[in-house]
Amino acid sequence: MAYHYLMDLALILLSTKLLGLLTQRFQMPQVVGALLAGLLLGPAGLNILTETEFLSQLSELGVVVLMFSAGMGTDVQELKNSGRAGFWVALLGVIVPLLMGTGLAWGANAVGLIESNNLLEDIFIGTILTATSVSITVETLKEMGKLETKVGNTILAAALIDDVLGLVALTLVSSLAGGGDSILLVLLKIVGFFIFAGVVGYAANRLFCWMLRCQNGWATHRNSVLAFVLCLVMAYCAEKFFGVADITGAYAAGLAVACTPKGAYIQSKYNPLGYLLLTPVFFASIGINVKFDGISGGMLVFSI
């Protein structure tokens, strides 16, 4: 049993690639195939695989590496230029699902599809629908070759800002319900994170440039290791101390590395790791975690 995880990984890697190729034939991203592989092998399907601590931690590392690589592949100047457009897209991406989700929840409750006791619960359901999956967005853009384009940067900026705005909205609703942190505390943490990310990212960027300049390229390989250390530390601090998703910290670390002369070289070291192992495990793990127990027909109709 100690080595059962090896067979689990083999099944995940094989199924995600096969179903990824299949979905690609139908003009869909391969990430859809990876999600379907998890559904098929998990409790919602054949029940061959179940979520384990090993798979959970490996999948979490997978999404961190995915966002770190996305940050390293981002044109920082283009991202700055796309910031305003990304903000308005993100703002609409929160407001529209929030209003429509709240209205649909109220209507679904009225006809008996779901049960909600008051308007606040309907608003909470609407708030949940504001969430986006930045990781799926990144993987799809990478597969399409659009991640480093103006459109890709706008979409990515919008997705990241949407995550932050969604967190603020969720905190506000939780505060109205009498639980969770205060909205002021959450806003201070978010501002604190961006200050932290800016200072640490700038310092790390200067350090990498100094090492390359002083050692005539000798430190290139070591910079790859230090870059990953930076990614892990920023991802941890984002989640632990600032209440921001770890993937946001990883992406910020990637942006810092992208500004160095060897940013593209360092990124090339992590792309194979993500493609061969970590990214497939992450997306398959999403499907494996899906369980239909306790989901009523009305809730299923509402979800669709």
Can you annotate each of these PLM segments?
Residues 1-12, 51-69, 117-133, 187-199, ...:
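Structural signature of hydrophobic alpha-helical transmembrane segments
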Residues 1-41, 45, 49:
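N-terminal transmembrane signal-anchor/hairpin module of polytopic inner-membrane proteins
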Residues 4-20, 75-110, 181-200, 290-304:
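Entry/N-cap segments of selected transmembrane alpha helices
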Residues 23-28, 48-57, 73-89, 113-116, ...:
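Interfacial helix-loop-helix linkers and transmembrane-helix boundary segments
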Residues 37-41, 56-82, 174-178, 247-260, ...:
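Hydrophobic transmembrane alpha-helices of secondary-active transporters
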Residues 66, 70-74, 100, 125-169:
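Short helical (or helix-break) motifs at transmembrane helix termini and adjacent helical loops
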